[in-house]
């Protein structure tokens, strides 16, 4: 759990340093939902801290199955997220497909380190 927390700290530091004017965080939860007592719940708690301590808006998406991830990621981006956090390696393909379509949005792909990044807007935390 400590390793996952460290990944978040590093990821958010990288993103904050290049997106000083960002004000909406979007979180796409992996299977298990945001209260899974593990990976997703850490993402939820971190996003809540960003919301409460930095004043950012929070946009969330919980897919019922993996086929909804890309659609949900697009919805979060279309709702104005300036930072999208994709939780888990199952979301790698969706990040790779969606991020180039939104070059002004930063994406953090947690537990992913093999995605091509032609737009330069994917931070891979693995």
Per-region residue spans from a language model:
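Extracytoplasmic "Venus flytrap"
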Residues: 25-50, 59-66, 89-91
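Bacterial N-terminal signal peptides that target proteins for export
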Residues: 1-9
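Hydrophobic alpha-helical
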Residues: 87-101
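Short glycine-enriched loops at secondary-structure junctions
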Residues: 64, 111-114
